[in-house]
A protein has these predicted regions:
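Transmembrane helical cores of multi-pass secondary ion antiporters/exchangers
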Residues: 1-295
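Cytosolic regulatory domains of K+ homeostasis systems
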Residues: 292-329
Length: 329
């Protein structure tokens, strides 16, 4: 980014610190878009690629947030040294992880112990607890995103009451928030400013998709010998950028960082390019690499939620006239 911005034909110059800030805001990926596209095509993934992509997407959001905040502080305060940056990272990580663990345990206990007559209030209670977790962690100078992520992992992997109602509510709320975010972010964009950074943004986007993402994926997966080459190639391709990078790009704008408007426009442009190029080709690449499987049809559970400790399941079956004729009545 810094090298490209120094070219005379770009008419754009970003200092090394601002270039790092731009890279930090773009480091978050969105696996939810990948799975939404696959579900629309009635496809699933082999080799447990889904949990790997979910882990990556969920874990890189807190890190992208920390990098963005620390780099903004570094740019605004020239006296901030490497030691202060490292200390800020450690404090945010430790406080965020500890708060997420403790409050996640508290959320599990609260959901299972409280007896609310109206079961529709359980998802509302958990949503309020999410905001509480983020707020109290941020008040303690920790990473609120990391705390919410860890608390969510704990709640999702423990036995809780009304799990299905909570999941359905949160899934719908996720889509609603994504629609609102893209609508609000679209209102912040000026088309003529997008044209000014189009060439540089396109080159950065191509570099990220073709070189940066595959290189980082292959380096990170080197210790995992059992992951096939096709799986590595697919993970390299599906590094979609969603609304989160655009949200992080608004932080420099709010902080009045030099070149912040340019950062926002570049991030927005790259996100749109990523969604168009990678988003439209996810299912094609999965089929090309023979990593797609038909989406398993789930039966009708008739609105009944069985406790997890009961080793049984509900299934539905269509009764035909031939079956009735052959039955012993």
């Amino acid at each position: 980014i810094w090298w490209l911005s120094g070219m005379s034909w770009t008419n754009i110059y970003l200092p090394i610190t601002t270039s790092l800030l731009l890279a930090a805001t773009m480091s978050s990926t969105d696996s939810a878009s990948v799975f939404a596209i696959l579900r629309s095509q009635k496809m699933n993934l082999k080799h447990n690629l889904r949990p790997m992509l979910e882990l990556e997407s969920g874990s890189n959001d807190p890190m992208a947030y920390m990098l963005t905040i620390v780099l903004i502080q570094f740019i605004q305060s020239a006296g901030m040294g490497v030691g202060a940056i490292a200390a800020s990272f450690i404090i945010q990580f430790i406080v965020g992880a500890a708060a997420g663990y403790v409050l996640g345990k508290l959320a599990i206990r609260m959901l299972n112990k409280l007896n609310i007559d109206n079961q529709a209030l359980y998802p509302i209670l958990l949503l309020a607890f999410v905001f509480f977790t983020f707020s109290i962690t941020d008040l303690l100078k920790g990473n609120g995103y990391l705390a919410v992520y860890i608390a969510g992992i704990m709640v999702g992997n423990n036995k809780i009451m009304h799990r299905k109602d909570i999941y359905t509510f949160m899934d719908g709320l996720t889509w609603l928030f994504q629609i609102i975010m893209f609508l609000m972010l679209g209102l912040l964009v000026n088309p003529h400013e997008m044209i000014e950074v189009a060439v540089v943004a396109l080159l950065i986007g191509v570099f990220m998709i073709v070189i940066g993402r595959p290189l980082s994926v292959f380096l990170c997966l080197l210790p995992f010998r059992k992951i096939t080459l096709k799986s590595r190639l697919f993970v390299s391709w599906v590094g979609l950028r969603g609304a989160v990078p655009i949200i992080f790009a608004t932080y420099p704008v709010v902080a009045n960082v030099e070149g912040s408007n340019m950062i926002f426009n570049i991030v927005f442009f790259i996100t749109i390019v990523s969604l168009i190029v990678q988003g439209t080709s996810v299912s094609f690449v999965a089929r090309l690499l023979h990593l797609s499987t038909p989406l398993e049809k789930t039966g009708n559970d008739f609105g009944v939620e069985l406790p997890e400790e009961i080793d049984t399941d509900l299934s539905d079956m269509t009764i035909t006239m031939e079956m009735l004729n052959e039955a012993d009545t």
